[in-house]
């Protein structure tokens, strides 16, 4: 058995946390030979609820669960953490302006980024799930950079939910098994502006674009369906997507840590300037993962429609970035 990995989870008492923690403890995220210690962060008023979740985790008698800590102090939660899942964020309440949402989350993620950089392992892997995920990841990274120690490239945002949503829509359209679809890409922000791009996707070497061969479906059905899926779930369920978000977080970390065997996945990462995306913007790119590192898939042709979509989602990210600039000093 390997030495335990410390996994910090924020918003541990929330809906996504509840769907996430049991799957981490069961070994779904890091494999069946990897014990974990869960370090659970939530607000002071949520500590009782966290204790209830911990009681349930105990009652599962997971062989891989080597320990648990509950706290409302980020410095304790992130102490020696190998992986940080930043799930907790301020949700948008009725009548709340986007600027207010950015402001509220800016404060949270500035504190957490600093605490991670001061307390976690130097090679810590950070995934921001809480929305607006790309900009929250950007804020955490910027706060962490002031401290140093940790690797800025390891502050990532979750676009895997958009990626998985796109795969399931393509599977339904083509009648192919979802697991057989490869080379899917999602570009940009985790928001309705994201660009799900199946121009390179294949099933057993056959082009998905050729199978579907319908630009109007792509533009008028596929992209809006994937982009607005979160809103459709809230409309139907009365609550935001929690289990599917938790599932995407598991996928994101598992692939990053254990590798993708050459398969493409989507991660929101600090741009290195690839595909004309300005350096430092947290942007969704197709990547492959190996030996605990990700690499952007290079050399893809960007046509006119794709460039327009990529620029639109970039413009939104730039606007969000300007909206939080004053918080970063």
Curated annotation (Swiss-Prot):
Active site, UniProt feature: 190
The enzyme's E.C. designation: 1.1.1.37
This protein's UniProt keywords: NAD, Oxidoreductase, Tricarboxylic acid cycle
GO BP, one annotated term: malate metabolic process
GO molecular function: L-malate dehydrogenase (NAD+) activity
Residues where NAD(+) binds: 11-17, 105, 112, 129-131
Binding sites annotated in the UniProt record for substrate: 92, 98, 131, 165
Disulfide bonds: none
Transmembrane segments: none
Reactions catalysed, as given in the entry: (S)-malate + NAD(+) = oxaloacetate + NADH + H(+)
Catalytic class of the enzyme: oxidoreductase
A Pfam family this chain is assigned to: Ldh_1_N
Family named by the database record: Belongs to the LDH/MDH superfamily. MDH type 2 family.
Its biological purpose: Catalyzes the reversible oxidation of malate to oxaloacetate.
Name of the protein in its database record: Malate dehydrogenase
């Amino acid at each position: 058995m390997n030495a335990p990995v410390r996994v910090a989870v924020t918003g541990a008492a929330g809906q996504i946390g509840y769907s996430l923690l049991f799957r981490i403890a069961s070994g779904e995220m890091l494999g069946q030979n990897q014990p974990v210690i869960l370090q659970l962060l939530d607000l002071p008023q949520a500590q009782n609820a966290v204790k209830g979740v911990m009681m349930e985790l105990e009652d599962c008698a997971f062989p891989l669960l080597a320990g648990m800590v509950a706290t409302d102090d980020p410095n304790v939660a992130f102490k020696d953490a190998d992986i940080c899942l930043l799930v907790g964020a301020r949700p948008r309440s009725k009548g709340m302006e986007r600027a207010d949402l950015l402001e509220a989350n800016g404060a949270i993620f500035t504190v957490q980024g600093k605490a991670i950089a001061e307390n976690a392992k130097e090679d810590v892997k950070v995934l921001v799930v809480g929305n607006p995920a790309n900009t929250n990841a950007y804020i955490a990274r910027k706060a962490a950079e002031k401290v140093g120690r940790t690797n800025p490239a390891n502050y990532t945002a979750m676009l895997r939910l958009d990626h998985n949503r796109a795969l399931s829509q393509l599977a339904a359209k083509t009648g192919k098994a979802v697991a057989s679809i490869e080379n899917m890409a999602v570009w940009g922000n985790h928001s309705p502006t994201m660009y799900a791009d199946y121009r390179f996707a294949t099933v057993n070497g056959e082009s998905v674009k050729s199978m579907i061969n319908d630009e109007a479906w792509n533009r008028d059905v596929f992209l809006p369906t994937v982009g607005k899926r979160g809103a459709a779930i809230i409309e139907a369920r009365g609550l935001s997507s929690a289990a599917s978000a938790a599932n995407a977080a598991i996928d994101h970390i598992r692939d990053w840590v254990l590798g993708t065997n050459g398969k493409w996945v989507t991660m929101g990462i600090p741009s290195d300037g690839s595909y004309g995306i300005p350096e430092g913007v947290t942007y969704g790119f197709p990547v492959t993962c190996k030996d605990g590192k990700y690499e952007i898939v290079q050399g893809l042709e960007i046509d006119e429609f794709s460039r327009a979509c990529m620029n639109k989602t970039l413009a939104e990210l730039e606007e969000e970035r300007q909206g939080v600039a004053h918080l970063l000093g």
